[in-house]
């Protein structure tokens, strides 16, 4: 069956159409700059990549555009061939501990969580409604970034703030990148051949977070109430003394919202280096001896190592350390800088194997006390797998209900 994975932002819509359960990517694409007359629509099949600039004023138009293109390019013959759609939704709060079939009730619950993710959930909802309008009979599912972390114990997800903040406003650590962590966890259970594996995962892209996993469950993670908490990233500061916000607001004559915006969009690599938020630019400048670039990278690496060491103690040892996402999968320098700072744990890097880019590989030596792996993530596939799983569950439930009705009526 054909399932579409969708990841929408406020001005973008990324999609991938997969044949399931074969896990075959049929087509992928992206609509950028939604809301302008200079939107960019890119669609890629196995053989060809098309790109066009055109007017796309809203998400509804973007959805209709991409679905029309699938038919025009003969990727599919009719829309009826699409049997499921999975939507990435950033915030599921404490309501959702698993992906959920999209119903009126589910959508209303997602809307109720917009206060917790004002930059993301509204855009996710707009995209969901757009797909529901064009594909009203198609089975659709919300896959949340936060559900994987709902297994964290209170001691790890609560802040030491007034407790009523949590009771009244749900102020707590929610984490992010959960779909990626779930996928990597399942991959590592297969690689290691054990369900009760203790794993530390470093998801490093423009957004960076870490997760401690025990027996397939998230125990702790670095991102918090929002993705701003944790380690420094491309443009995010990571952990910072909250009093700095008020101090800078007064000194710079800015609102609190503006200072938070600076911490989200003008900090991290970009803020410290003054060069770029892109790791490739930072690494190029490090090679040239740029001290600010070196400092920005060292700060990030130091904070990542802090989390790994903390999670090692939390888990009472680990079976594997895993690097994934854009930087984690492709930067040998990034990985080596982290691993060499972990030598006290007996982890030993294999320099030759560490040259790998974008492929699964064990990158430590045979006598390393901890195994370290590069494992590519695949969030689109993970979303499609959840759609397939929930659809099969619903089909089985319908059969059980019919059987029960038959027995009662008979």
UniProtKB/Swiss-Prot annotation:
Its cofactor is Mg(2+); Mn(2+). ATP binds at residues 14, 203-207, 278-280, 326-330. Pathway: Metabolic intermediate biosynthesis; acetyl-CoA biosynthesis; acetyl-CoA from acetate: step 1/2. Substrate binds at residue 88. It is found in: Cytoplasm. Mg(2+). Can also accept Mn(2+). The active site is at residue 145. Mg(2+) binds at residues 7, 379. This is Acetate kinase. The gene is ackA.
């Amino acid at each position: 069956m054909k399932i579409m994975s969708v990841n929408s932002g406020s001005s973008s819509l990324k999609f991938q159409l997969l044949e399931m359960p074969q896990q075959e990517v049929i087509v992928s694409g992206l609509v950028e700059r939604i809301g302008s007359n200079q939107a960019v629509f890119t669609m890629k099949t196995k053989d060809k990549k098309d790109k066009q600039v055109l007017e796309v004023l809203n998400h509804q138009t973007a959805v209709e555009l991409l679905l029309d293109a699938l038919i025009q390019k003969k990727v599919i013959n009719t829309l009826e061939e699409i049997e499921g759609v999975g939507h990435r939704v950033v915030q599921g709060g404490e309501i959702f501990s698993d992906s959920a079939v999209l119903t009126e009730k589910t959508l209303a619950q997602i809307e109720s969580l917009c206060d917790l993710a004002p930059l993301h959930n509204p855009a996710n909802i707009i995209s969901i409604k757009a797909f529901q309008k064009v594909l009203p009979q198609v089975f659709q599912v919300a896959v949340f970034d936060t559900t994987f972390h709902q297994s964290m114990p209170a001691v790890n997800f609560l802040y030491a703030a007034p407790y009523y903040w949590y009771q009244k406003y749900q102020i707590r650590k929610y984490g992010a990148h959960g779909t990626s962590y779930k996928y990597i966890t399942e991959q590592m259970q297969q690689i290691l051949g054990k369900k009760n594996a203790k794993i530390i995962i470093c998801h490093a892209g423009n957004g960076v977070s870490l997760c401690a996993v025990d027996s397939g469950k998230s125990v702790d993670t670095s991102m918090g109430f929002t993705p701003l908490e944790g380690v420094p990233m491309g443009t995010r500061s990571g952990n910072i003394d909250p009093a700095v916000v008020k101090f800078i607001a007064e000194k710079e004559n800015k609102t609190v919202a503006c200072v938070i915006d600076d911490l989200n969009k003008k900090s991290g690599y970009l803020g410290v280096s003054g060069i770029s938020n892109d790791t490739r630019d930072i690494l190029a400048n490090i090679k040239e001896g740029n001290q600010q670039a070196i400092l920005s990278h060292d700060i990030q690496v130091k904070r990542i190592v802090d989390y790994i060491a903390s999670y090692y103690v939390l888990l009472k040892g680990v079976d594997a350390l895993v690097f994934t996402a854009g930087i984690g999968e492709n930067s040998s320098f990034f990985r080596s800088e982290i691993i060499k700072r972990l030598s006290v744990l007996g982890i030993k890097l294999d320099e030759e194997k560490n040259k790998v880019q974008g492929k699964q590989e064990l990158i430590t030596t045979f006598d390393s006390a901890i195994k370290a792996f590069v494992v590519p993530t695949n969030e689109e596939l993970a979303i499609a797998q959840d759609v397939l799983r929930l659809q099969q569950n619903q089909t089985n439930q319908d059969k059980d209900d019919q059987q029960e009705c038959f027995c009662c009526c008979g």
